[in-house]
Design a protein with these regions (language model features):
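Positively charged, solvent-exposed patches that mediate nucleic-acid binding
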Residues: 1-123
Length: 123
């Protein structure tokens, strides 16, 4: 379970991150990362939100995918910059993959997002 201060809750945060954040995708999920650039971050810790649509499966399957993603992010939240907002969107393929494959795809997406964000800040 993610700490409460690391959970994205407000629809405004989701909307802003999905519209303005950098996007990177993998086979089972895609991510949107928004850094608090040029302004004071609203919080010192990164916030993570999850989007798992009905296309992924039934409510039981969607909740299982969210639980798996939350558990994987719990160990990786420290690698995110403070004050950033991250939205992870699960693809339908996420329901049928092993935990190790989902973890590898998450690492791939996070690596791409962080490289793109650092590159954008340098410009």
């Amino acid at each position: 379970m993610l700490p409460q201060q690391s959970r994205m809750r407000s629809p405004e945060e989701f909307k802003r991150t999905l519209r303005s954040g950098r996007r990177a995708g993998g086979a089972t999920l895609s991510g949107h990362l928004l850094l608090a650039s040029g302004q004071v971050p609203t919080c010192a810790v990164p916030k993570v939100g999850f989007v798992v649509s009905r296309a992924v499966g039934s409510a039981v399957v969607r909740n299982r995918v969210k639980r798996r993603l939350r558990e994987l992010m719990r160990g990786r939240i420290a690698s995110l910059p403070g004050g950033c907002l991250l939205v992870l969107r699960a693809h339908p393929a996420a329901a049928g993959v092993r935990q190790a494959d989902l973890a590898a795809d998450l690492d791939l997406v996070l690596g791409r997002l962080l490289r793109r964000q650092v590159g954008a800040l340098r410009q």
